């Protein structure tokens, strides 16, 4: 689940970051403000919003999707959507300042020499934002691994199907017995270790000028 969430955030994070920085259009400021919405509302609210839209026959789109055999709520797709939504701003907020900093001079020069938009992005823009993108992806991964509220609402916590590591921690911690407590703390420690290790590795690999 975390893998798919990070993949979605990588693609959408770059695209949404470019829109308000490189293009002028009505509603550009509104888009910039909406980027922070997932950080401003409770993850529980995010989960309830997804229920409102995709829940079975009562959701706005749930009945239509179920008619074609696609289940969103209480299934992996809903969990991926919830996790991607709450962690997307972490990617965008790393990339946007770098795009402002590098400006558009090199991109305009490349286009004046005949480079296509795709070539310009691949050879100029992407290399310039690569460390910001990587750091944002790592933050997104850490957030995805630790997400609890939104996932709990949309997943149902079905063991071996929609139960994430964070939901397992909660379930085992609330159960009696030394073994369950040890399992809960072990899973929590592993999640925290993965997040910390990923951040340390990326920070260590960053060029010194990128760290300043």
Regions found by a protein language model. Give the residues of each.
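Hydrophobic alpha-helical transmembrane segments of multipass integral membrane proteins
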Residues: 3-12, 16, 42, 122, ...
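Transmembrane-helix boundary motif in ABC transporter permease subunits
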Residues: 3-35, 48, 52, 199-207
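Membrane-helix interface segments
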Residues: 23-31, 60, 75, 117, ...
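Membrane-interfacial helix termini and adjacent extracytoplasmic/periplasmic loops
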Residues: 28, 47-84, 118, 155-158
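Short hydrophobic faces within alpha-helices
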Residues: 37, 105-113, 184
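Transmembrane alpha-helices
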Residues: 37, 85-87, 91-99, 103, ...
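Transmembrane alpha-helices and adjacent helix-loop boundaries
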Residues: 39-47
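Interhelical loop and adjacent transmembrane-helix boundary motif
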Residues: 151-197, 201, 208
